Amino acid sequence: MFVDQITLELRAGKGGNGVVAWRKEKYLPKGGPYGGNGGNGGSILIEAVTNMYSFEEYRNLRFLKADDGQAGASNNRTGRNGKDLVLKVPEGTLLRDAATGELIHDFTKDGERIVVCQGGRGGKGNVFFKTSTNRAPTKATPGKPGEIRLVELELKLIADIGLVGFPNAGKSTLFNTLARTEVKVGAYPFTTLHPSLGLVHQEGMLYQKPWIMADIPGIIEGASQNRGLGLDFLRHIERTRLLLFVIDISGIERHSPEQDLKILMGELLAYKEELKDKDMVIALNKIDQLLPDEREERVALLKQQFPDQEFILLSGLTGEGVDALYDLFKSKLSE
């Protein structure tokens, strides 16, 4: 199950109590204080990792707690420190304070790690309080409580390529072709109910780092006002390096391709105007359903209405035009 938002209560460990104890040896009838300090409570850390793409493993949890520190002991022994708890999250995770909405950290790289809740300090045993004037202190202090924090985790996928389009534009079929995977495909709206990630290898570049591609669930008119799957998934578009708009040029499923493209771009810019500066390519999909003359006519109309856009013709079903798309990825993403 894809989970890209979650709220958790994080509880760091309590420090162990210091103890009052006395040195008791056969030839030291008046032995002094011998109580040790408590161990520190475990802290909670969050670390970004690759190969993790949602918060699914945390979805049934309400809170997470680190270990408490152990109490001190006689013979001036310090209690064991509580074990830290490290939460793994995907790259692209935003960590916020749930109470204030304050952004605590934006995890963008593998291995980034921060302390979110500090463990409590261990209490002091009576050895700590021994002085020249108080050689037999009876005082010890309890451990400090660990920090407690309610946090929100929000994921914005980091991908090289983001596939964007209306439901049934053929995104999932194209995704399967490019990533050589099997995303569910069907002739009804919202076949893709959550973002899917795949690796795109071009023939002849198997020893190079593949591109990460995200199939974003179908966007509908009004998505920027949270219609359909709306804002839940529009945020995943923000961090992709290249947006690949997938438009059904056949016009069979919906209204005209030019109207689809106009609405789609309008929704993205209504969500966040800064997206206009992102690199975009328009993939005119399902050309296998058109005769050559029909293709030329519709492409000419689109280029007339969108003269500044870059178009590529292809068929995710038959593979026609896919090699040219690979070449385009290479030129765009190698810059």
Curated annotation (Swiss-Prot):
Subunit structure: Monomer.
Predominant localisation class: cytoplasm
Any one GO cellular component localisation term in the record: cytoplasm
Cofactor: Mg(2+)
Enzyme Commission code(s) on record: 3.6.5.-
One Gene Ontology MF term: GTPase activity
Entry-linked CDD domains: Obg
Protein family per UniProt: Belongs to the TRAFAC class OBG-HflX-like GTPase superfamily. OBG GTPase family.
Record localization: Cytoplasm
Residue ranges occupied by any OBG-type G domain in the UniProt entry: 159-334
Keyword Magnesium: yes
Source species of the chain: Chlamydia trachomatis serovar D (strain ATCC VR-885 / DSM 19411 / UW-3/Cx)
Coiled coil: none
Keywords (A to Z) from UniProt: Cytoplasm, GTP-binding, Hydrolase, Magnesium, Metal-binding, Nucleotide-binding
Protein's name according to its UniProt entry: GTPase Obg
Gene3D superfamilies found in the cross-reference section: GTP1/OBG domain (2.70.210.12), P-loop containing nucleotide triphosphate hydrolases (3.40.50.300)
Binding site residues for GTP: 165-172, 190-194, 215-218, 285-288, 315-317
